[in-house]
Design a protein with these regions (language model features):
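FIC/Doc superfamily catalytic core
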Residues: 1-41, 47-312
Length: 312
């Protein structure tokens, strides 16, 4: 499988991305219209264990019916793409591997905490939502008083977290290409290719630090060097996170992508989660500015280990 490694990793990422997209879709099945007492109602029809089931959606409207039709077509296309990817993986000799019990437990731990993690990340980004609003957005429910931009950011965080929690993806290396794919998901809807390395100067608010333009080969090499050091997994995860933040690898979404990237590494080691809790965001931002401006990693690293490392 060695010669086909890159191709297999790309297919696995595509497969996990499709599965994450399908998880975001609110409806599964084909729409049908039922009439009762001169009123029309919309249902979703789906075959489960050989039996047809029908789930109520809402009162009929042309707009909702067209939405359900588009949803059904998109899901059908995604299922077709999944079958194609699985065939290609089989041709390349790929077989699904068993994950260790510890990693499986960590995946469950991450899924159980995903809503809280997304809310904490949203607070770090200045997204103005309450936890109940964030929860409604994650569950694809309607919310009021929240900007379309903030809704998109939260959905993108959900998409990125679901991506790294896929069993195939968690077995993939925490390398530059993984970071780029996470950034692409985080920036979806805001940039044409949010996972492309930054090619323009940027400034960071609240600090005199101006990150130089990143060089792709240098970023690839530094990530590999950090991963190869003989350190505890939490220390490696923190260093990966802080290096990517300070480097400002992408045009936007660097904090979001860096945290999720670090969690991809940490979960794969079965070592918990790394998320800045809402109450610790102000202190983290102060330490982050000091780190940007030259303070050694150990100061913010100690803070992250003591206040932001969730273990199970």
């Amino acid at each position: 499988m060695g010669a086909n490694y890159s191709e297999i990793q790309e297919l696995l990422q595509q497969r996990a991305d499709i599965q994450a997209r399908m998880n975001l879709m609110p409806y599964d099945g084909n729409p049908e219209i039922k009439v009762s007492n001169d009123a029309r109602y919309l249902y979703m029809r789906k075959r489960v264990a050989g039996k047809l089931t029908s789930t109520y959606v809402d009162l009929y409207s042309d707009e909702l019916y067209q939405l359900l039709l588009r949803n059904a077509k998109e899901r059908k296309d995604l299922n077709k793409a999944l079958r194609k990817i699985n065939k290609e993986l089989a041709v390349l000799g790929y077989e699904d591997k068993e994950l260790s019990t510890r990693v499986l437990q960590n995946l469950d731990f991450a899924r159980a905490n995903m809503k809280a993690n997304i809310y904490d990340q949203a607070v770090l980004e200045g997204v103005a939502t309450t936890f109940p609003q964030t929860e409604d957005i994650i569950e694809n429910r309607k919310v009021s008083g929240v900007s379309a931009t903030d809704v998109q950011k939260i959905l993108n965080l959900k998409h990125a977290w679901e991506f790294i929690l896929d069993r195939d993806v968690i077995q993939s290396e925490s390398n530059y290409h993984m970071l780029c794919h996470i950034a692409k998901l985080v920036n979806e809807g805001f940039f044409y290719d949010g996972g492309r390395i930054r090619g323009i100067p940027v400034q960071i608010g609240g600090t005199s630090y101006v990150p130089p333009l990143p060089v792709e080969s240098a970023v690839i090499g530094q990530i590999e060097e950090i991963r190869s050091r003989d350190k505890d997994p939490i220390e490696t995860a923190i260093e990966l996170c802080m290096y990517c933040m300070k480097t400002q690898v992408f045009k936007d979404g660097n904090k979001r992508a860096s945290v999720i990237f670090a969690n991809h590494y940490l979960i794969a080691q079965g070592m918990g989660l790394l998320v800045i809790p809402e109450k610790d965001v102000p202190e983290f931002k102060k330490l982050l500015v000091r780190y940007y401006e030259g303070e050694p990693l150990e100061f913010i690293g100690t803070f992250l280990k003591e206040h932001c490392w969730k273990r199970f």
